[in-house]
Amino acid sequence: MGRLASRPLLLALLSLALCRGRVVRVPTATLVRVVGTELVIPCNVSDYDGPSEQNFDWSFSSLGSSFVELASTWEVGFPAQLYQERLQRGEILLRRTANDAVELHIKNVQPSDQGHYKCSTPSTDATVQGNYEDTVQVKVLADSLHVGPSARPPPSLSLREGEPFELRCTAASASPLHTHLALLWEVHRGPARRSVLALTHEGRFHPGLGYEQRYHSGDVRLDTVGSDAYRLSVSRALSADQGSYRCIVSEWIAEQGNWQEIQEKAVEVATVVIQPSVLRAAVPKNVSVAEGKELDLTCNITTDRADDVRPEVTWSFSRMPDSTLPGSRVLARLDRDSLVHSSPHVALSHVDARSYHLLVRDVSKENSGYYYCHVSLWAPGHNRSWHKVAEAVSSPAGVGVTWLEPDYQVYLNASKVPGFADDPTELACRVVDTKSGEANVRFTVSWYYRMNRRSDNVVTSELLAVMDGDWTLKYGERSKQRAQDGDFIFSKEHTDTFNFRIQRTTEEDRGNYYCVVSAWTKQRNNSWVKSKDVFSKPVNIFWALEDSVLVVKARQPKPFFAAGNTFEMTCKVSSKNIKSPRYSVLIMAEKPVGDLSSPNETKYIISLDQDSVVKLENWTDASRVDGVVLEKVQEDEFRYRMYQTQVSDAGLYRCMVTAWSPVRGSLWREAATSLSNPIEIDFQTSGPIFNASVHSDTPSVIRGDLIKLFCIITVEGAALDPDDMAFDVSWFAVHSFGLDKAPVLLSSLDRKGIVTTSRRDWKSDLSLERVSVLEFLLQVHGSEDQDFGNYYCSVTPWVKSPTGSWQKEAEIHSKPVFITVKMDVLNAFKYPLLIGVGLSTVIGLLSCLIGYCSSHWCCKKEVQETRRERRRLMSMEMD
């Protein structure tokens, strides 16, 4: 049943698909045009196959029966001979608007062009379907539209602003068809044109841009007079109404449900000239008034308007002789309703019809400037509206206020002058010989700095600080940070004295300083206005710059001594060009030049700062903590002593002295540093010579094995009893193939037999022991990969002197021995292999077990037996 119901739907869709084909369209309704206008007929094609760009052929028939070729988009010889000349002149042309659309344009249509126009398209389809042409009828009407002005030639109207005027034009049509007329009034002023008011073909009014408000107020109107006259009425003319007025009439006809314009005509109606109103405003040019008196200015108006215009007068003030510049302000205003708007100190009065007075009471210096009188004439408009008909601004009236200027002098002197850097500087700026009242005048100061220059170049001044009329101090860029740090201090100790102090004068502060004292006069509104500036003479802050000189001489009172005696050295200091110096001393020792183990080593022993505080620097001999003394003998002399000298103390000793100069508070500034001549300690001995070497029977081991390293000491020269010598032994390692890394201390054994072992980050252990008198054994137990590298020992011998004291010899170092730690490949891979084999076996057995269980229980199929009939054989024997 369902299949039968769907058959009609399928048949309908099939028939629709079969009927679908090319569609050519032109306007369906008859096109009506007027002789002399342009005819445009569009044509388009849709639902076609083939290329996207289609070609079009146009044909014409006056009666609709036989068509003559008119134009083609693809065949040059298609048009008939009758239309070849019009095509060449461009009166007939085809304009493609899209790949599937084209327009036929016929300019200057004539009655002979009335008829039927056919648009056809050549076939590009696989099968011929649809329509390939379409026809539209065109009617050509005679020109029956008549448009003209009310008077010929067009008149020229000369008006003044505010006066009314009217313009008329006639328009009528004798068309046999039902048409509507539309009318537009347009004004031309130079190249620009503006629409004033329009009456559409639907009978609606549309004011032009800028005329909306005047149209709604009734100032601009459009109405008809009789059957064919249209009147434009303007109740009050404006300057913008000047220009040439045109009347543009268009004829419209209903076409395909819409209105189509079929022709348009324009005519010049009149030229309107708006004569500007004469308006001038005059004020006195220069006026002088004493401070505290009244300022009276008169503005006289001259105009040619005698109608009911109303003036609006505004008085404004500016510091500049140009009222258009920013900064001018309005003092008083009299509007067109004779209402005055002003401040309490300003009055505006109307003396007569052409004179207006401005009165400013209690004038002061701030009233000096330029005064302007601004006059506007307003004429009444429609519906109680007003519009401006004239405007004028007077020339400026210069007003000068004479007042008693404060009279005073300014002197600047330096109460403190620096002699060195970091000394304070103090300047005092005094105001003297004042001759004005204290109640109405106050003084402020500005401080300036100018750099010294040897050349004649002009140097600009830099602002240090400026004080406003309310005594608010503002810092300049040069002094802002130092003033915040308290280094620059600006103060006012008395009413007539301003002070500037530099707590710590630097070399950059040298130069010329001057002050500017400003007088401020109190105004009637209790504000203060600057009235005068007086400059002081500059004061030069300068001191000669000389290099600081510091000389240190060291001497040795007892030049000859033996080991175990006391070494004494004194350092004498002399300085120049350093202010109130204090000295800090550092005693330093250098290895002798002949000591090849460390030729550039410098050791700081003891120091004494500028406050006489003693500090041990790198003196690490625990047995001689009190063995060195540094003391201050005089302000410029220091003495260094070293008790119980040893052979290891040999070297060059110097005094490094630093001179310190005091700055603000308890701070000190480093002024200079100098090094003394060296004093040498040299022991001429014929004692033994010690050497150290490292030996290992196992330079290459497997990880986990024991590493043995022997530090062997040999003695050359005089034989010593084993009890007369002892050793401090330290083991170091550089864990790299080269010696590019810093050595790491492993373990040490001092001469008293105390062993110290450094902390390690891996599992191997260290042990250090003395095997014999001259042999020391370092053992690494359970060696790791990190234990590879260069190993060496450092030995410090101690020898007992004949007096029974122990003398420390120079430290010696052995040459390094490289130790390699290898990995045991069999042991490394034994357990991983066993674990892998075991896991593989377990996984294989488990896989077999899973397969067996799956095949036995999950995949077993039930087999049905075929029933067979079993019949016994019958015996063939016959009874």
From Swiss-Prot:
Residues 854-879 are cytoplasmic. It is found in: Endoplasmic reticulum membrane; Golgi apparatus, trans-Golgi network membrane. It is a single-pass type I membrane protein. Residues 26-832 are extracellular. GO terms for biological process: lipid droplet organization; myoblast fusion involved in skeletal muscle regeneration. Residues 26-129, 149-268, 276-394, 406-536, 544-662, 688-813 form the Ig-like C2-type domain. A motif (Cell attachment site) lies at residues 703-705. Keywords: Disulfide bond, Endoplasmic reticulum, Glycoprotein, Golgi apparatus, Immunoglobulin domain, Membrane, Phosphoprotein, Repeat, Signal, Transmembrane, Transmembrane helix. The keyword Methyltransferase does not apply. GO terms for cellular component: cell surface; endoplasmic reticulum membrane; Golgi apparatus; membrane. Glycans are attached at N44, N286, N300, N383, N413, N525, N600, N618, N691. The chain crosses the membrane at residues 833-853. Residues 1-25 form the signal peptide. SUPFAM superfamilies: Immunoglobulin. A motif (Endoplasmic reticulum retention signal) lies at residues 424-427. Disulfide bonds join C43-C119, C169-C247, C299-C373, C429-C515, C571-C655, C711-C793. The modification Phosphothreonine is found at T271. Pfam families: V-set (PF07686). InterPro entries: Ig-like_dom, Ig-like_dom_sf, Ig-like_fold, Ig_sub, Ig_V-set, IgSF_V-set/TM_domain. Interacts with CD9 and CD81. Part of a complex composed of CD9, CD81 and IGSF8. Also seems to interact with CD63, CD82 and CD151. Inhibits the binding of prostaglandin F2-alpha (PGF2-alpha) to its specific FP receptor, by decreasing the receptor number rather than the affinity constant. Functional coupling with the prostaglandin F2-alpha receptor seems to occur. In myoblasts, associates with tetraspanins CD9 and CD81 to prevent myotube fusion during muscle regeneration. This is Prostaglandin F2 receptor negative regulator. It comes from Homo sapiens.
